A protein has these predicted regions:
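Flexible beta->alpha loop and helix N-cap segments adjacent to enzyme active/binding sites
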Residues: 1-209
Length: 209
């Protein structure tokens, strides 16, 4: 269950009342943002990585929004986790305290090199320890106590976010991206194209959809 809060409890109660076992395929149950017909998902992923390689933060709004409190790549702000200043840059955009770190999204097949214990956590529900390489090279996604709240993306995940991570890894040798929710502190998530336009104009952050 990708929503450990009250909304998840209500869904669980509804499932119990329904009386049948539900197969949970993914956490994307919200509003759908239609992808532009002028480019393929691969072209979109390549454009996003090119933007990130310029040391810029960007938003992504793909397909259906996530159900639950975690941004899992369909309504996310993403950035390079390696730069020592990136945490401050994203916190400034989101109007959060500077000390607060962000979550990592990692290609599942490389997670064991960066996090321990090595857990499969596609819904960002586990806090684990960063390995030595993480503590030394990925300061933007590590808490003060050396832990990280991780999202793993498996090789069977046919999402644009997986493509972004694969291309990012190919270009940088780093299979990890900083991932946080596509909203500003105290405001709702970007949900549709109109929200994305407003976000871009107000906060000067490119949103890809």
């Amino acid at each position: 269950m990708p929503n450990p809060g009250d909304a998840g409890a209500s869904l669980g109660a509804a499932a119990l009342a329904y009386g049948k076992k539900l197969l949970w395929k993914d956490a994307f149950l919200g509003h759908r943002t239609e992808q532009s017909l002028t480019r393929t998902s691969l072209q979109l992923a390549e454009q996003i990585v090119a933007h990130l390689l310029e040391h810029k933060v960007c938003g992504v709004a793909f397909g259906r929004a996530e159900f639950g409190p975690r941004a899992l790549g369909n309504r996310s702000l993403i950035a390079d986790p390696r730069g020592p200043d990136m945490k401050d840059k994203v916190n400034e955009i989101k109007k959060r305290q500077k000390f607060r770190p962000f979550a990592p999204a990692v290609l599942e097949e490389h997670a064991h090199k960066y996090f321990e214990p090595n857990v499969i956590t596609p819904y960002m529900q586990h806090v684990v320890n960063g390995t030595k390489i993480t503590l030394q090279t990925l300061p933007a996604i590590v808490h003060e106590d050396g832990t990280c709240r991780v999202q793993t993306i498996n090789k069977f995940d046919n999402t644009i976010f997986r493509q972004v991570l694969e291309i990012w890894y190919r270009e940088t040798g780093c299979p990890v991206l900083l991932n946080t929710s596509l909203n500003i502190r105290g405001e709702p998530m970007v949900n549709n194209v109109e929200d994305a336009w407003r976000f871009e104009e107000k906060y000067d952050v490119k949103v890809f959809y």
